[in-house]
Amino acid sequence: MFSKQDQIQGYDDALLAAINAEEQRQEDHIELIASENYTSKRVMQAQGSGLTNKYAEGYPGKRYYGGCEHVDKVEALAIERAKQLFGADYANVQPHSGSSANSEVYLALLQAGDTILGMSLAHGGHLTHGAKVSSSGKLYNAVQYGIDTRTGLIDYDEVERLAVEHKPKMIVAGFSAYSKTLDFPRFRQIADKVGALLFVDMAHVAGLVAAGLYPNPLPYADVVTTTTHKTLRGPRGGLILAKANEEIEKKLNAAVFPGAQGGPLMHVIAAKAVCFKEALEPGFKAYQQQVIDNAQAMAGVFIKRGYDVVSGGTDNHLFLVSLIRQGLTGKDADAALGRAHITVNKNAVPNDPQSPFVTSGLRIGTPAVTTRGFKVTQCTELAGWICDILDHLGDADVEANVARQVAALCADFPVYR
């Protein structure tokens, strides 16, 4: 028998030490990885609840196990809130991750060997949009579009040319490192021209979409996926959305269960329900606007300091800094910033001469720093510190000076009070 007083402390101190160290790192470091954020304690409470114990294969009202009457209510809440948040007619909250959701969309709507047209990983796309190392690039005939390297913008004429040439069964619109607004009507027009399905992966901008600060793809796409973390600020998980279409809905449900997954993670679905409720609150829009304001302020500092920002700026929560002109690598810059307790990620940029393990760029995002309370003033100052380190890459004195300022700023803006 277990006791409600059981704790990790005193039982598994090695594990507890690692957990505590990570939580302290989150407090002491400035987080600028675009895909990371901090969840509320409410989300954590739901995810750490007794729902962890319940197996519930199937869907609400159609389970393969008994005792699901309460978890049915949990999943129904998550579904209805997701539909309300994004104006969707259909929502599946069971995908374990964004990548799982994408794979399940392909499983539902494609056959092995079908052609898909997605954004190149090297130009800002995602692994699951047809990269050769991904199952999406192994199971399907993946054709890749990219950006115009002169402007940093998606070349929609090139997308259309490729679509006409290759006749894809599905066009994938979405990104992991693109700072401008996607033209969903143009994607829909191209898809209709060649008779393709349009699939939108809005994982990075879902929070902005929910707040009405980024175009909603639902009116244009046949199916939409997202993660529930990143800008949505919920637990790590996936979500599939669609307009009313009984045939597609049945295929999507069957692809998730039993096609790709067994029992859903009910504790995570509960945390998703909390996240969606938080995103429906009036203050969520103000948060998302601040995310954009902070990103634009930071990008402006880099431009003023002589660094190339891909696409010339940002419309959302992230931007890419190219270090090609400075002759620096993303790997070295990432490491130097880490020593100053600033966490970013190295990232490939257009025309990158370096390997994906080295790169010539940095991806910077503002969801996490905005959650801890940073405004434009703090983000402008922070961008200046990053430029100082890049201007004097490898200078231990500069890194130490920035680290001291980072420590003071983190103390003023704790993640959890």
Swiss-Prot record:
The lineage of its organism: Bacteria, Pseudomonadati, Pseudomonadota, Gammaproteobacteria, Pseudomonadales. The modification N6-(pyridoxal phosphate)lysine is found at K230. Belongs to the SHMT family. GO terms for molecular function: glycine hydroxymethyltransferase activity; pyridoxal phosphate binding. (6S)-5,6,7,8-tetrahydrofolate binds at L121, G125, H126, L127, S355, P356, F357. It comes from Pseudomonas fluorescens (strain ATCC BAA-477 / NRRL B-23932 / Pf-5). GO terms for cellular component: cytosol. Pathway: One-carbon metabolism; tetrahydrofolate interconversion; Amino-acid biosynthesis; glycine biosynthesis; glycine from L-serine: step 1/1. Its cofactor is pyridoxal 5'-phosphate. Pfam families: SHMT. One of its GO terms (biological process) is glycine biosynthetic process from serine. SUPFAM superfamilies: PLP-dependent transferases. The record marks H229 as: Plays an important role in substrate specificity. The keyword Phosphoprotein does not apply. It catalyses: (6R)-5,10-methylene-5,6,7,8-tetrahydrofolate + glycine + H2O = (6S)-5,6,7,8-tetrahydrofolate + L-serine. Catalyzes the reversible interconversion of serine and glycine with tetrahydrofolate (THF) serving as the one-carbon carrier. This reaction serves as the major source of one-carbon groups required for the biosynthesis of purines, thymidylate, methionine, and other important biomolecules. Also exhibits THF-independent aldolase activity toward beta-hydroxyamino acids, producing glycine and aldehydes, via a retro-aldol mechanism. Homodimer. Keywords: Amino-acid biosynthesis, Cytoplasm, One-carbon metabolism, Pyridoxal phosphate, Transferase. CDD domains: SHMT. Its EC number is 2.1.2.1. This is Serine hydroxymethyltransferase 2. It is found in: Cytoplasm.
